[in-house]
């Protein structure tokens, strides 16, 4: 079974994608830097998890799986 992301990671990622839709791409490294700039997350692990979920959301939007 896979790991389930915590609710606050999903919530923060969704808020970032909705608030700054043109800031994020499908590139994880770029998204990681943007998450660092736009949030006050101090933990590297949490920042990377948020950036990973942002990347997934952007990819899903491009494929038309979410609105």
From Swiss-Prot:
Transmembrane segments: none annotated. InterPro entries: Ribosomal_eS17 (IPR001210), Ribosomal_eS17_CS (IPR018273), Ribosomal_eS17_sf (IPR036401). The keyword Isomerase does not apply. GO terms for molecular function: structural constituent of ribosome. One of its GO terms (cellular component) is ribosome. Keywords: Ribonucleoprotein, Ribosomal protein. It comes from the Archaea. GO terms for biological process: translation. PROSITE patterns: RIBOSOMAL_S17E (PS00712). Signal peptide: none annotated. Belongs to the eukaryotic ribosomal protein eS17 family. Part of the 30S ribosomal subunit. This is Small ribosomal subunit protein eS17. It comes from Pyrococcus furiosus (strain ATCC 43587 / DSM 3638 / JCM 8422 / Vc1). The gene is rps17e.
């Amino acid at each position: 079974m896979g790991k389930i992301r915590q609710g606050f990671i999903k919530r923060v990622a969704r808020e970032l994608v909705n608030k700054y839709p043109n800031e994020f791409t499908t590139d994880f490294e770029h998204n990681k830097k943007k998450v660092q700039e736009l949030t006050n997350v101090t933990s590297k692990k949490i920042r990377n998890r948020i950036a990973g979920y942002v990347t997934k959301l952007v990819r899903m939007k491009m494929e038309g799986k979410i609105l």
